[in-house]
């Protein structure tokens, strides 16, 4: 969504020339940074998935395994698997929205070929992370803005976190590695 609080509208309804310059197209993003990284995108527009996949794979066919598409509708998300067997699909939800319970959701995600579940940091526990891992799912936590939250999510065994603060995430990974008796440089060979 773009615009102020009173006039928000879907980005697909806005001409490219009317978007702020800090909002790149996928092509501009890849032209600027290349494709040698994992990219996670929230599909806020239910029709965006096919275009995102086409643009990403049109730029670099190897991007599929590094493209993580997140949607709050896991049934709709699963239909994207037909477009590429290698893209990563992420059910992005809240624990309170999982009416059938976490174990049944995990089983359904496994059945649909979904790769991960992404919950708000406050929804996670170590037991819940273990449950989803038992079904072969990666576990992600979003809105991890503070050290204590990042540290807690990593201690719970989450596979990934979403934060607005890259240096904090790197520091949290280093602290987690030290706590587990590992050398942080083994996890980050390029250094801080």
Describe every region a protein language model picked out.
Residues 34-39, 63-67, 85-88, 113-115, ...:
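Short, well-ordered coil/turn segments that N-cap beta-strands
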Residues 20-21, 91-192:
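C-terminal active-site rim and adjoining tail of enzyme catalytic domains
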Residues 48-59, 75-85, 100-110:
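Distinct, well-ordered alpha-helical segments
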Residues 67-70, 142:
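Short beta-strand-to-loop elements that line the ligand-binding cleft
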Residues 1-38, 44, 91-92, 178-192:
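An active-site metal/cofactor-coordinating segment within enzyme catalytic domains
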Residues 36-42, 47-67:
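Active-site cleft segment of glycoside hydrolase catalytic domains centered on the general acid/base Glu
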Residues 70-73, 86-92:
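Aromatic-lined carbohydrate-recognition surfaces of secreted/lumenal glycan-active proteins
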Residues 31-32, 82, 130, 155:
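Solvent-exposed polar/charged
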């Amino acid at each position: 969504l773009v615009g102020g609080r009173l006039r928000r509208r879907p980005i697909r309804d806005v001409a490219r020339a009317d978007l702020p310059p800090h909002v790149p197209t996928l092509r501009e993003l890849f032209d600027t940074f290349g494709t040698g990284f994992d990219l996670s995108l929230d599909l806020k527009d239910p029709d965006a998935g096919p275009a995102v996949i086409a643009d990403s794979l049109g730029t670099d066919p190897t991007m599929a395994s590094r493209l993580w598409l997140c949607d709050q509708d896991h049934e709709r998300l699963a239909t994207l698997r037909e477009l590429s067997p290698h893209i990563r699909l992420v059910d992005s939800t809240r624990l309170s929205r999982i009416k059938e319970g976490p174990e049944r959701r995990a089983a359904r995600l496994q059945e649909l070929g979904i790769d991960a579940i992404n919950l708000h940091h406050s929804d996670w526990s170590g037991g819940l992370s273990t449950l989803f891992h038992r079904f072969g799912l990666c576990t992600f936590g979003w809105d991890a803005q503070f050290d204590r939250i990042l540290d807690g999510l990593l201690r719970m065994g989450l596979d990934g976190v979403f934060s607005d603060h890259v240096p904090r995430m790197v520091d949290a990974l280093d602290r987690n590695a030290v706590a587990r008796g590992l050398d942080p440089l083994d996890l980050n060979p390029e250094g801080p």
